[in-house]
Structures are given as structure tokens and as C-alpha cells.
A protein has these predicted regions:
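Gly/Pro-rich cap/lid or specificity-loop segments adjacent to the active site
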Residues: 4-8, 12-236, 359, 363-364, ...
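Core-facing hydrophobic residues within beta-strands of well-ordered domains
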Residues: 176, 395-398
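Alpha/beta-hydrolase fold active-site neighborhood
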Residues: 231-357
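Short beta-strand/loop motif that positions the catalytic acidic residue
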Residues: 368, 373-376
Length: 432
């Protein structure tokens, strides 16, 4: 192992089975950057952040400038390059950069917090999870940049990763060469309730659009809702799926091919094993990354508490029509129904009452000169277009491309076309 810093352990470059060159970084960073003195589960004041640096083969790896990819979520690790991972978008980036894939703190190989009793009690684990937001993720990135001896680097943020990019611009714009954001501009200056009012309206419209395309599915969804209301709808694993959790199938509509995937699911017999198996794997939240549900609302909290905002802010029209679908709207009862989330409920309750600090400084954002480009998806049901454009207008060097061609996952689904468009836009090669 070679060391660029006493706190950094870096491997040598090696070839991977995908034909890429890869090296691994492990960096020790402070857990608590807020000064409250919180400690890691092992009693230390530090955690480890892992990053995988990737370069195209056949070149000197350091010959291309560095770009950090910040993953969506929150609570999800960076993607792992593999032959069947659908990472054609990564290939497009590697034509111009070497890419650093960071597992954000608490995920993947970065001191993962993967059990509700990780810190010994719900209260202690909740305290631990308060340190997994964009503010401290950005400071981890800064520590890694410094440890690698880099003066500047570029960023690409997808969804929540774009929130991290915005925080980075707010705090350390001088460290950034160029920034790219895909479906991920936060709602600076807006409350979480305002955000959910917009996303619920987007999901109402998306639901109606879906039923216009597949009219029979409204009756199918109504029947499933009746079964769910009687406690008769279950996954193959035996979890009871209530009416509200059933609605979360609407999250499928936020990605490429999601409408067809939902339609194919609803065509199946609700009593069949295949339906119940696919249902369990299609529901939003839970599963492999419980953090996605547990800390989800915190990513929208630019100060204040969240207090189960998605549950509080839901419009009356959703109460009247059980066939209207929801998206990234976490409801408390979903924790009670999902065996994977149930142990996290006490932690989630504590986080819902936590007083979150502000994340963004509009004055500093307005003073930045970093060039960049953002893809704003007109049909995005997860990140509202109106607040996205308001935030983009605060950042002088950020050019926006508004498109209805892609859903929220356009960066991945386009196979690199979105990134190439943003690169040309940021460089001034195209105007929009």
C-alpha cells in the first residue's frame, strides 16, 4: 500500500475484470464535525470513508483530471463497476476524466451503519445517523481531496448527490473545477412541507397519466387496495402490505421503463407467488438500504425538524382516491409493516424530531464562479422542477438544460448522453 497522507491508505492501480484500472482509498475522518463530541460505535472519534478510483485502461491513469461521483439516496453506496451493471454512463465520463466513486459515510465500505442497534441503543444510533447528511459528506470529500494532493476536482451529483454538490458550492467552491448535476438541485429556501406539496402534485399527475395509458390498471389497483385494507395483501416473505405501502409502487413511475414494470406487475394474479414476490421487490424503501427510508426526509430539511413531513403534508385528494400513487414519500406505518424496517422505527421517530441545521448559504452560492451544468427533468416526480430552477438561478456559473426526454434516472438510462450534453453545456460549446 502507498500512503499520500498519514490518514489515507491507497492501493496501487490494478486491472479489473471489466477492463478498467482501479485503485482503492481508505481515509480516516472525524465522525462528528459539529463539535458535539459524538463518538463512533467503537468509542473512537473517527470513521473510515472508502473510495474507488477508476480509470480507462490503456492510458496513464493520472493523465486525466479527477471527477468525484456523488451517489443518489441518501443512504446508498456508490455503484460498483461490473460487466453487467449497466454503467455505460461511466464509460462516457471515463473518456474525459478518471472517476472517484465515494461510498458516502455510513454506507458500503465507509463504516456502514447497517443495524438499528449499531451504536447500542435507538437514541445512540439516531445520533450516529445525524452525521450522514450532505454537510459532513462534503467535508469528507474535502479531506480526501487534500489527502490526495489535489488542488481542485470536478463533481457529478445524481439526485441527493446533487444536493451534496450544492452544499460543496456553498462551502468550498474554490476546490471545484466544474460541477455537473443530474436531477438533483435542492429546494434552497423552501420548507420540506412545500417540497412535498409539489411532489405530491407531480405524483397525482403521473398517476393519471399512467391510468390514461393503462385504463384497466386503475380497477386492478383499486382491487389491491381493498385487499390491503383488509390485511389480505402480502409479499412472498409474509409481510402484510397496507394501503399506504401499496401506493409506494408509484416510485416505479419515476424511472425509465417504470410504467411498463408496474403494468406487468398489476397484470399478475394477486394470489400468485410471482405477484407476491415481485410486489415485495417493487415497493419503495426497505430492502438492502434501510437508510434510504430512515434518513430520507433529512435530505430535504434545510433547518428545522421533519416530523414525518410526507405523512403530514399529503393532500386530501390522496385520501379520497386510493388509486393515486406516491413516490419518495415515507410514511410511519410502512416501518411497522416492513420486517426489514420495523427494527428501525424507534430510530426513525427520533430523527423525525431532530432539529436539523441549515445546509445552504444563498449568499455564498450567489458569489460562486465555478462553471457547471445541471439536467433538470421536467417530468421528475422526486425533485420538483420549480424549486430546482429557483436554486439553479442562485448559482451564476450553472447552466441548466430542461428536458422531458428522461425521467429522474436519465443520467443512467441515457447511457452517457446526459453527461455528454452537460459537459458541452458547461464548456460553452452549446447554449442550452
Amino acid at each position: 500500500m502507498s500512503n499520500a497522507s498519514p490518514l489515507l491508505r491507497s492501493s496501487n492501480w490494478s486491472s479489473s475484470t471489466t477492463g478498467l484500472l482501479i485503485r482503492h482509498h481508505h481515509l480516516s475522518v472525524p465522525l462528528d464535525r459539529s463539535g458535539q463530541g459524538d463518538l463512533a460505535p467503537d468509542g473512537s472519534d473517527s470513521i473510515t470513508v472508502y473510495a474507488r478510483e477508476v480509470s480507462a485502461a490503456g492510458i496513464e491513469p493520472l493523465s486525466r483530471p479527477p471527477l468525484v461521483f456523488l451517489q443518489g439516496g441518501p443512504g446508498c453506496e456508490a455503484p460498483r463497476p461490473s460487466a453487467d451493471a449497466g454503467l455505460s454512463w461511466l464509460g462516457a465520463i471515463l473518456e474525459h476524466y478518471r472517476v472517484i466513486l465515494i461510498d458516502q459515510r455510513g454506507t458500503g465500505a465507509s463504516s456502514p451503519v447497517d443495524r438499528p442497534d449499531a451504536a447500542g441503543s435507538p437514541a445512540a444510533t439516531a445520533r450516529l445517523l445525524t452525521h450522514l447528511r450532505a454537510d459532513e459528506i462534503v467535508e469528507d470529500c474535502e479531506d480526501l481531496r487534500s489527502a490526495l494532493g489535489l488542488e481542485r476536482w470536478s463533481l457529478l451529483g445524481q439526485s441527493f448527490g446533487g444536493f451534496c454538490v450544492t452544499r460543496y458550492l456553498s462551502e468550498h467552491a474554490e476546490s471545484l473545477e466544474t460541477v455537473y448535476i443530474t436531477g438533483g438541485l435542492p429546494a434552497v429556501g423552501h420548507s420540506i412541507d412545500e417540497v412535498y406539496a409539489l411532489s405530491y402534485e407531480a405524483m397525482r399527475a403521473k398517476s393519471e397519466e399512467y391510468y390514461d395509458r393503462y385504463p384497466k390498471d386503475r380497477d386492478r389497483m383499486s382491487h389491491l387496495s381493498e385487499l390491503a385494507g383488509r390485511g389480505e395483501l402480502t409479499t412472498a416473505g409474509g409481510d402484510i402490505v397496507g394501503t399506504e405501502r401499496l401506493r409506494s409502487l408509484g416510485a416505479l413511475l419515476g424511472g425509465a421503463g417504470g410504467a411498463d414494470a408496474l403494468h406487468h406487475l398489476l397484470e399478475r394474479d394477486p394470489d400468485s407467488w410471482t405477484f407476491r414476490y415481485d410486489l415485495g421487490h417493487s415497493l419503495a424503501f426497505g430492502g438492502r438500504s434501510p437508510h434510504y427510508a430512515v434518513i430520507h426526509e433529512s435530505c430535504w430539511a434545510d433547518a428545522g425538524t421533519t416530523d414525518w413531513a410526507a405523512q403530514r403534508a399529503r393532500p386530501a385528494v390522496f385520501e379520497d382516491d386510493p388509486t393515486l400513487l406516491t413516490g419518495e414519500h415515507v410514511r410511519r406505518e410502512s416501518f411497522a409493516e416492513d420486517t426489514g424496517l420495523r427494527p428501525w422505527l424507534a430510530v426513525a421517530d427520533l430523527l423525525a424530531a431532530h432539529e436539523w441545521p441549515a445546509l445552504y448559504d444563498p449568499t455564498r452560492l450567489k458569489a460562486t464562479t465555478t462553471p457547471g451544468a445541471a439536467a433538470v427533468y421536467a417530468r421528475d416526480v422526486f425533485v420538483p422542477i420549480t424549486t430546482s430552477l429557483e436554486t439553479a438561478a442562485l448559482i451564476p456559473g450553472l447552466r441548466t438544460w430542461i428536458t422531458s426526454e428522461y425521467e429522474h434516472d436519465g443520467s443512467r438510462a441515457s447511457g452517457g448522453k446526459v453527461f455528454n450534453r452537460l459537459r458541452d453545456l458547461a464548456a460553452g460549446m452549446i447554449s442550452r
